[in-house]
Amino acid sequence: MNIEELNNDELIDLYPKLLDQLKNRGIIRTKNIIGELGEYIAKREYKYNPNLPELQLNLSSTKNIDATSIKGERYAIKSLSTKQTGVFPSLPLEDDGVVYFEYLILVIFSKDYVLKEILELTWKEFLCFRKMK
């Protein structure tokens, strides 16, 4: 098998052996493999769906905001392979009236990291469904 001839989805399927190649191709940027794959897949799916805005991934250091639409809408992207997503440690416990992002994209994987579905919540929907830290 020539690893250079694999497409991105094949690389993702082989991820335990291919972390370096994934980084070289710009698919992941950090060691947070699940989060990085979720961001990559969200960006890809939004790009190819004419009903959704194209997303630009932000710098890894941007607090709570993973991507921005061409209209300036801020997106948080969370990936999960269980029934719970990660926490937002920089968000206050109580609603302080500040909108920290307009949309939350949930990229949901199976336990084998196969994409199951992508969900999008507004900020208000996120506030209704989130669990406290």
Model-assigned labels for residue ranges:
Residues 1-74, 78-133:
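Nucleic-acid endonuclease domains
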